[in-house]
Swiss-Prot record:
Principal location: virion
Name of this protein: Hemagglutinin-neuraminidase
The keyword Aminoacyl-tRNA synthetase belongs to this UniProt entry's keyword annotation: no
Organism for this UniProt entry: Newcastle disease virus (strain Iba/85)
EC number(s) per entry: 3.2.1.18
Length: 571
């Protein structure tokens, strides 16, 4: 009985235990369901609240604010970029130019102090105003695309005349020579007291100066030192060059006419002089018997020389001694240059015969008139290590007055059109140690010179002539690869007479609008031109030193004509 009761009690307890666990399980399941529903509801509410129309409308506002932040950030970065560009493209070059100016001033001042200590000279250092540093002897216009003749000269500008004029009716100032370096310029001309045709006695005026800018921004040439070489020496055909030691000048010493000189059998006396920064002038006779042993007449080219690689280079021309080694080396050599789009009517063999004869004009007794270049080492000693280069006549025409120029890294020889070829010629020139090599020239068809028939301005065929006039071109417009595109110069715009001086910019075919000195009947002669830039304003200027007729005081007055180079964008 008791065992039966115990079994019943045990079964009841087991049943109650099972019911308890079921209840716990059910409660747990219900709690999980409730929690799941709650989480789902919360998620649903959240998702519905996140995509309300109000929030959707605020998206564009948020994006706009983000755009503003990005734009502000970019603007800030652009300011940095602009500052970097200004520093690199504008301020750094100017700083370099100023540094160059400071260094040049310091070096020049030091050299002056040393020089002054040696000669008791207390002179100051000559150097152009900082406005010109980096604007002298450089490629002034570098342009591959613009028409060269879209550049043109302004009207002539009033500026300080740094060239003395004759003071009597019989006075004569002629044959200007000019050269300008990065620190100073040098100028010289011949002074004759009794008319321009007197060959027996003359003075030589020589000046050293710098470029200045006035308080109103005007360009002017300031003469710092000048001297009039009035002695028993009759210097002629002088060429001047600005060198680190002052103004180097090469002259011939003559007492006879040019025709008589060519008839002689001895070379012409030559002298190398130097006008120092302290105003002292010294010179030394050249060893003509060695240097010019193959010549009967020899002259500097009148145009300026150039300082290249510690040497000064001067143009030379004159007559070779018949059957001398130099004369024999040129025998049979010739070159024919042709006008643009203007062929020769003569037969080829006749052209060649006339071209060969052009080197031996009858005026000088059939002597071969030859071009040459003389280089002299620039040191405290004058006339040191002179070397004469005689280029082949397969490159050069008959010898004539000329000029050696350096612009940028390029060197050129201008040769006056004394022979049959009227357009201006610039021979590219390379130098190696003491010698020079000339290459086929740039020609400027519209930059002509007047001449006597059959070698007048429009002439096109080879002929034997001694004619023309010295009117050098200055390299002005370059390609980016440094080849020459155009030049500036002042030409005499007449067929035969030395009349009508006009300034213009020239390419190989044509010319720009011109600036005239006066009427077409204005008498003129030699012109020599040099261009430079005022770096601060980026304005390019050109100076043409021209011999202009002067009816009251002397036959000619040498006038420095100054123009600004402008651009016509319509061309």
């Amino acid at each position: 009985m008791d065992r039966a009761v115990s079994r019943v009690v045990l079964e009841n307890e087991e049943r109650e235990a099972k019911n308890t666990w079921r209840f716990v399980f059910r409660i747990a399941v219900l709690l999980l369901i409730v929690m799941t529903l709650a989480i789902s509801a919360a998620a649903l509410v959240y998702s519905m609240g996140a995509s309300t129309p109000r929030d959707l409308a605020s998206i564009s506002t948020a994006i706009s604010k983000m755009e503003d932040k990005i734009t502000s950030s970019l603007s800030s970065n652009q300011d940095v970029v602009d500052r970097i560009y200004k520093q690199v493209a504008l301020e750094s070059p100017l700083a370099l130019l100023n540094t160059e100016s400071i260094i040049m001033n310091a070096i020049t001042s030091l050299s002056y102090q040393i020089n002054g200590a040696a000669n008791n000279s207390g002179c100051g250092a000559p150097v152009h105003d900082p406005d010109y540093i980096g604007g002298i002897g450089k490629e002034l216009i570098v342009d591959d695309t613009s028409d060269v003749t879209s550049f043109y000269p302004s009207a002539y500008q009033e500026h300080l005349n740094f060239i003395p004029a004759p003071t009597t009716g019989s006075g004569c100032t002629r044959i200007p020579s000019f050269d300008m370096s990065a620190t100073h310029y040098c100028y010289t001309h011949n002074v004759i007291l009794s008319g321009c045709r007197d060959h027996s006695h003359s003075h030589q005026y020589l000046a050293l100066g710098v470029l200045r800018t006035s308080a109103t921004g005007k360009v002017f040439f300031s003469t710092l030192r000048s001297i009039n070489l009035d002695d028993t020496q009759n210097r002629k055909s002088c060429s001047v060059s600005a060198t680190p030691l002052g103004c180097d000048m090469l002259c011939s010493k003559v007492t006879e006419t040019e025709e008589e000189d060519y008839k002689s059998v001895t070379p012409t006396s030559m002298v190398h002089g130097r006008f120092r920064f302290d105003g002292q002038y010294h010179e030394k006779d050249s060893d003509r018997t060695t240097l010019f042993k193959d010549w009967v007449a020899n002259y500097p080219g009148v145009g300026g020389g150039s300082f290249i690689d510690d040497r000064v280079w001067f143009p030379i021309y004159g007559g070779l001694k018949p059957n001398s080694p130099s004369d024999i080396a040129q025998e049979g050599k010739y070159v024919i240059y042709k006008r643009y789009n203007n062929t020769f009517p003569d037969k080829q063999d006749y052209q060649i015969r006339m071209a060969k004869s052009s080197y031996k004009p009858g005026r000088f007794g059939g002597k071969r008139v030859q071009q040459a270049i003389l280089s002299i080492k620039v040191s405290t000693s004058l006339g040191e290590d002179p070397v004469l280069t005689v280029p082949p006549n397969t490159i050069t025409l008959m010898g004539a007055e000329g000029r050696v120029l350096t612009v940028g890294t390029s060197h050129f020889l201008y040769q006056r059109g004394s022979s049959y070829f009227s357009p201006a010629l610039l021979y590219p020139m390379t130098v190696y140690q003491q010698t020079a090599t000339l290459h086929s020239p740039y020609t400027f068809n519209a930059f002509t010179r007047p001449g006597s028939v059959p070698c007048q301005a429009s002439a096109r065929c080879p002929n034997s002539c001694i004619t023309g006039v010295y009117t050098d071109p200055y390299p002005l417009v370059f390609h980016r690869n440094h080849t020459l595109r155009g030049v500036f110069g002042t030409m005499l715009d007449d067929e035969q007479a030395r009349l009508n001086p006009v300034s213009a910019v020239f390419d190989n075919i044509s010319r720009s609008r011109v600036t005239r000195v006066s009427s077409s009947s204005t008498k003129a002669a030699y012109t020599t031109s040099t261009c430079f830039k005022v770096v601060k304003t980026s304005k390019a200027y050109c100076l043409s030193i021209a011999e202009i007729s002067n009816t009251l005081f002397g036959e000619f007055r040498i006038v420095p004509l100054l123009v600004e180079i402008l651009k016509d964008d319509r061309v």
